[in-house]
Regions:
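Glycan-recognition and catalytic cores of secretory/periplasmic carbohydrate-active enzymes
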Residues: 1-397
Length: 397
């Protein structure tokens, strides 16, 4: 295996294609903000609102990228995302961040969705790791306190989905229109785990440590259906199961995010338990979630597999399978990681206009989804490149 050549592919993809596109096309120097929507064809919508998920993911990505390549332009992108989040998203009266904000800084949707609040913590922790900015650390810790106060469920464990802007119960808790309106979800827990893990890197206190362990246990004991090797997506407050959908992208993403959390926590028995789960979930994903050409299906609902290959499950497959190879040293997982990367190179990367398509359909032609939007930032593909560079660096040492 020529590790150096393999690594260079990810380095070039990250700097020349993904980050370069965001610097040149998504940041608007005149308005000092980001375009909240850009189509596949490159049409820009200056009036489009910025979502919290989108803006925090820009902050995380460019902060993380700066740690690999400390360049002034990456710092500027991170600084601008930081400024926008602090000046316009942060609720000065109640704390926490709004769901979406218009380009002029006025809130569009003021709800507090804990998925987005977690991404704020994840990004602020990364900004501190990159620039040692004390305000970022302060904000990340404040968000931890708010989430423990308003999202944590002391009765049944885990975290609820959403509150109003002033932390009251809300009658619509859904993350997006396609989600169920329930109290708890796998997706929100996955990104709270990811955020708390990053916070623990910068704020090593017992309170955070206990919560990282609690979240890993929630995944192993409640969210993972051990019998079938899939994560359950939706629950009532008391963990009554509310869905029978298999999400292959989330399954493979969770294998490595759970493992990362366990390793940051550093408890041997938890690491071993997570590794066992990661191997089983990887095997199930290979057997059920991959098409013959190497693309990962979006999901299976009511026995029907959706023949759609969105960008983000492909990115998570590269890292997830590589991580399982690192755990097992079984060549098949490395092969599947490389196969996923080849599928991305062949079908997902937009070689003409830059960045990645939303995905491809069964005919392997690009889907109509926007290239940049509330749910499409530089995070899944940018993080994949950085994770692969980091992991290959460790092997080369």
């Amino acid at each position: 295996m020529n590790w150096n050549n393999f690594k260079k592919q990810f380095e070039n993809e990250l700097t020349d294609n993904i980050l370069n596109y965001w610097v040149k096309e998504v940041y608007d120097t005149n308005r000092r903000t980001f375009f909240g929507r850009i189509t596949n064809e490159g049409k820009k919508f200056p009036e489009a609102a910025l979502s919290a998920v989108f803006t925090t993911r820009i902050l995380w990505t460019f902060s993380a990228a700066y740690r690999f390549y400390p360049t002034a332009i990456y710092k500027k992108m991170a600084d601008e995302a930081f400024r926008i989040l602090v000046e316009t998203f942060w609720d000065n009266e109640n704390g926490g961040i709004y769901w979406s904000v218009f380009p002029d800084g006025k809130p569009e949707d003021t709800k507090k969705q804990f998925y987005a609040e977690a991404f704020f913590m994840y990004a602020m922790s990364e900004y501190w790791l990159a620039f040692k900015d004390e305000k970022a650390k302060q904000l990340a810790v404040s968000m931890f306190m708010l989430m423990e106060k308003y999202a944590f469920d002391p009765e049944f464990g885990g975290y609820i989905e959403a509150k109003t802007d002033d932390w009251k119960d809300t009658d619509d808790q859904r993350l997006s229109p396609k989600d169920l309106d329930v109290k708890k979800s796998m997706n929100t827990h996955l990104h709270i785990l990811e955020a708390y893990t990053n916070l623990y890197r910068v704020y090593k206190v017992e309170d955070v440590e206990k919560k990282v362990e609690h979240l890993i246990r929630i995944f192993l004991d409640k969210i993972l259906d051990e019998k079938i090797g899939h994560l359950i997506l939706f629950f009532d407050k008391d963990w009554t199961v509310r869905s029978e959908i298999d999400s292959y992208g989330h399954d493979i993403e969770a294998t490595w995010l759970m493992h990362e959390a366990a390793e940051v926590l550093g408890k041997k028995e938890i690491i071993e338990e997570v590794e066992k789960a990661a191997i089983k979930m990887s095997d199930v994903t290979i057997n059920e979630g991959l098409a013959p050409h190497g693309g990962m299906y979006y999901e299976k609902a009511e026995g029907h597999t959706q023949e759609q290959f969105d960008w983000w499950p492909q990115a998570e497959a590269v890292v997830g399978f590589f991580n399982t190879w690192q755990i097992t040293k079984d060549q098949k997982y490395l092969d599947y990681s490389q196969k996923s990367w080849k599928f991305i190179q062949d079908y997902i990367i937009d070689k003409k206009n830059g960045e990645w398509f939303w995905g491809v359909g069964a005919d392997l032609k690009p889907l109509r989804g926007d290239k940049v939007g509330p749910w499409k930032g530089p995070y899944h593909n940018g993080r994949m490149c950085m994770e692969m560079i980091r992991r290959i660096n460790m092997i080369e040492k």
